[in-house]
Amino acid sequence: MIALILFPLILLTVLVSLLYWKQDQVVKELLQTLNDDFAGHFEIKESHISPFENFPYISIDIEDMVLYENESKEGVHILDVHDTYIGFNIWDILYGDMEIKSILLNDGSINLVQHKDGSFNITDALATKVEIEDPTKEFHLNLKSINLADIDINKLNESNGMYFDLFINEAKSNFKTVADDVQMFLDSKFIVTYIDNGDTTFIHDKHLDVHTEIDYIAKKDILKIVPSEIALEGSVFNMEGNIDFADDMFLDINFKGEKPNFDLLIAFAPEEIAPTLKAYNNRGNVFFNGSILGKSINGHTPNIDAVFGCTEAFIENTSNDKKL
């Protein structure tokens, strides 16, 4: 009985010791490979073993990972993450196989900039200096999951001042490979803000929950979003569509929503007036149809269309019993 209890503890100790012994070599090789292969410049502060943070994987915690657009390190960083956990399978470690199975980014920021010529700072940074025949072998990757926690992603378009801010409270994704195609299952909670050339829009501090499956079709270089659910400020929408990477990231995404009250409209209302709208009793057949269609990179901006409708509606002011 005592042996059965002690065996898992002894095994875990052995595995952590093996990873501790190899961590410096793993991190050094990874950092050198990244800087040798890509135009951008990566830096880290230090690393240590974290057995349980990314369980069931045993992880190396890379502290304060930073990515700059180029080796001169001019301008704002692209990536600055306090903790980057790279996870390894327990049994793989025993056999000396150090493939990275999981990545967890915790507490940081990603700053994306679309330059006036249409290029992105991140694509410039990840432009390869040498030909990479197989990225999975080059970086010892066999990813099964990528997770984010408390990551602030923002995107600025220098030509028109459009600015998006996406604060990810939590995002969990799992991968399954079928031939050359990849299925990804995503659950996430985040807050989104959109600023148009310095002016705040109605999309400000909106809370979204996304539950979706995304399929990447390798031969066509297309990302397919299967029918999924999005919750915006508590109102549920359906979403589906495609992203064609080969055609300047052509977006063809559709949204639909229906409610027996005005919750759909309130979900899109500016933050300062939403509490006032919620104070009224309301009812009606409210629907929303939205779409994003068109190329989205290299100087292109997709068309965004939204249509609201309502039938058999009424609004009641509970303070004076007046109805509209």
Regions found by a protein language model. Give the residues of each.
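Solvent-exposed loop/turn segments connecting transmembrane beta-strands
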Residues: A231-V236, N317-N320
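N-terminal type II signal-anchor transmembrane helix
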Residues: M1-A39
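Secondary-structure transition motifs
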Residues: G40, Y57-S59, E63-D181, N197, ...
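Short beta-strand segments that buttress and anchor functional surface loops
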Residues: D64-L67, V226-L232
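Short extracytoplasmic
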Residues: D36-I60
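Beta-propeller and related beta-repeat scaffolds in trafficking/envelope systems
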Residues: V76-L79, D181-Q183, D187-D221, I266-N285, ...
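Outer-membrane beta-barrel proteins
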Residues: I90-L94, I292-I297
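Transmembrane beta-strand segments that form the barrel wall of outer-membrane beta-barrel proteins
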Residues: I151, D221-E229
